[in-house]
């Protein structure tokens, strides 16, 4: 491959997970003419995760959508399922293996974008000026395979994060042979279960997330909101208990684990001087989860990452510097902060809060809120669905005082009690239908 004058590459991408691969693939697919090197410490990719998002049919990742649902369900433990549906939008599921393969195929077809696996990146610092490189331009990255120089660096590496809450989950895609009791969670046939079996205690919210993939297979996750990250083994125990309660106990002859996934997502990320962050170096942009890709109140990030990768690649193709994720609009940021502070202040009421929004907010309004498209009327509907006083008390910003680092607190997981059966799945009465101009 040709070498960019004065640098090893125009752009070096640190970390080739979802965000790093998305940007590299966009640049490989386009015709920017930039020399790009993406490095990652992993030596290969596995089917270790999946991503979901709401969308219509008109997006360029449609070929790798493995499954979609036109209805999705919320349910408080023991209560009826509340089914949501929005015309023209589906809840779409992308397997990690398919996304990795798609991105790598685009990269491998390019003669100017290169993926280097098994390479650990270290310090990032500014380059000294030279005859061909003016002062203030250029970055050098120390890696396990030697130094790399570039005009710009996009750093997507994961790092320790301070946040108000952590969304800890453990999931298994299982072949259950048709034994999974979705009715116990109020999930109707053909629907996904986003937050079902919701229950809360003094430590926070727990719920079961179920994506039926066929008549005999499903992804089942146990999720816990916690002030600190939880031990993977303890969250996994909650997942196993949920599977057993739903009629698909691991180890049973009719149940086979196809793959597993787990993670910890920061909710209400708070910048901290002690955070493991890239120093402020000209030409360096932080992106991915560490750069604010995840929505504070939900943890959703895949669609936001794809939008950022597209915008960043377009800027680079025009000869402009890369960009990070756009800052959250003031109102959205404050609503998410107030909501998360309320979850911290009254963890035992969190299931009630989510159930109230599912019952009291029209599906199209709630969906726009979750996908960063909320209108003022949507925000007012969200506010009206929740109890006033607990949220008014959270108007003062306490996020920094509440933020916890990602140091583990192993004492916060509680055993998952048996799932109580729900009444027959039903579509609960919703607010008056929105007019066409409200939904458009």
PLM segments and residue spans:
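Beta1/beta-strand and adjacent pyrophosphate-binding region of the FAD-binding site
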Residues: 2-19
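Redox-cofactor binding/interface segments in oxidoreductases and associated redox assembly factors
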Residues: 14, 155-156, 286-288
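N-terminal FAD cofactor-binding segment of flavoenzymes
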Residues: 22, 26-79
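Predominantly flavin-linked oxidoreductase catalytic cores and closely associated redox partners
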Residues: 26, 109-255, 268-273
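Conserved N-terminal/central alpha/beta ligand/cofactor-binding core
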Residues: 56, 62-108
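Flavin-binding catalytic cores
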Residues: 228-261, 285, 306-329
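Conserved mid-domain beta->alpha element of the FAD-binding
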Residues: 270-343
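C-terminal helical "tail/cap" subdomain of flavin- and related membrane-associated enzymes
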Residues: 310-440
């Amino acid at each position: 491959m040709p070498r960019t004058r004065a640098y090893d590459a125009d752009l070096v991408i640190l970390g080739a997970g979802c965000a790093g691969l998305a940007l590299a693939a966009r640049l490989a697919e386009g015709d920017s003419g930039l020399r790009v090197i993406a490095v990652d410490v992993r030596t290969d990719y596995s089917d270790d995760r999946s991503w979901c998002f709401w969308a219509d049919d008109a997006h360029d990742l449609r070929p790798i959508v493995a499954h979609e649902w036109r209805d999705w369900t919320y349910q408080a433990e023991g209560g009826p399922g509340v089914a949501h549906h929005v015309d023209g939008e589906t809840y779409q599921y992308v397997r990690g293996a398919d996304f990795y393969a798609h991105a790598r195929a685009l990269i491998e077809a390019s003669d100017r974008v290169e993926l280097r696996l098994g390479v650990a990146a270290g310090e990032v610092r500014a380059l000294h000026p030279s005859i061909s490189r003016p002062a203030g331009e250029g970055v050098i990255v120390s890696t396990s395979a030697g130094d790399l120089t570039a005009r710009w660096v996009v750093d997507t590496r994961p790092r320790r994060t301070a946040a108000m809450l952590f969304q800890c989950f453990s999931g298994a895609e299982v072949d259950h042979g048709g034994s999974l009791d979705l009715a116990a969670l109020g999930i109707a046939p053909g629907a996904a279960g986003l937050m079902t079996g919701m229950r809360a205690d003094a430590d926070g919210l727990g719920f079961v997330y179920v994506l039926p993939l066929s008549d005999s297979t499903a992804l089942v996750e146990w999720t816990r909101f916690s002030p600190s990250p939880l031990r993977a083994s303890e969250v996994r125990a909650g997942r196993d208990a949920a599977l057993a309660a739903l009629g698909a106990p691991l180890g049973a002859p009719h149940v086979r684990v196809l793959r597993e996934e787990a993670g910890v997502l920061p909710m209400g990320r708070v910048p901290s001087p002690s955070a493991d962050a890239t120093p402020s170096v000209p030409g360096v942009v932080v992106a991915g989860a560490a750069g604010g890709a995840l929505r504070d109140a939900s943890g959703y990030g895949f669609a936001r990452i794809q939008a950022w990768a597209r915008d960043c690649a377009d800027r680079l193709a025009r000869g402009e510097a890369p960009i990070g994720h756009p800052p959250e609009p003031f109102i959205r940021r404050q609503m998410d902060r107030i909501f998360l502070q309320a979850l911290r202040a009254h963890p035992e009421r969190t299931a009630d809060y989510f159930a109230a929004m599912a019952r009291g907010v029209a599906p199209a309004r709630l969906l726009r809120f979750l996908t960063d498209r909320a209108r003022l009327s949507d925000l007012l509907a969200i506010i009206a669905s929740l109890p006033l006083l607990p949220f008014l008390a959270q108007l003062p910003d306490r996020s920094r005082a509440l933020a916890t680092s990602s140091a583990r607190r192993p004492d916060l997981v509680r055993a998952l009690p048996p799932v109580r059966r729900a009444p027959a799945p039903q579509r609960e009465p919703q607010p008056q239908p929105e007019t066409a101009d409200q939904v458009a």
